[in-house]
Amino acid sequence: LNVNSIMNGILPTVKIMKEQGYGCIINTSSMVSLCGQRSGIGYPTSKSAVNGLTWSLARELGPFNIRVNAVAPGITNTDMVASLPKEMIEPLKAAIPLRRVGEPEDIANAFLFLASDMASYVTGEILSVDGAMRT
């Protein structure tokens, strides 16, 4: 699902980006694509495939001035995380060196950076936004 939906979204737009001579693609990966997780192999495996797709497309599309990157969010304050019992949240926070979960704005800012001219020479990167949890 993760890779197929990304491919279905990217392929039609690549033609337009090539014609205009530039473009920027930012995929959504996950922290677990870089470090794995204990339970369930499907999600980290599919997100690892997103990373591979990102790296390959960066190499393939770079000559057309199309940058391809991904953001790998860590635990983020979403409705799903907010619904977890407090006794589950506190150990998660303790495992994050910044001692907090990320906010949606933290993730959005990573996307904004990669989409901006400040990242004009950044391609093929998986940007972790996880408070250093995976280190």
Predicted features, each with a name:
Residues 7, 70, 93-118, 122, ...:
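C-terminal helical subdomain
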Residues 34, 72-83:
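Short, flexible catalytic-loop segment of classical short-chain dehydrogenase/reductase
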Residues 10, 46:
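Active-site helix of classical SDR
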Residues 30:
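Residue(s) in the substrate-gating loop at a strand-loop-helix junction
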Residues 35-41, 63-64, 99, 117:
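Active-site loop immediately N-terminal to the catalytic Tyr-X3-Lys motif
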Residues 51, 61-76, 122-129:
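Conserved Rossmann-fold SDR core element
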Residues 15, 55, 59-63, 120:
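Alpha-helical segment proximal to the catalytic Tyr-Lys
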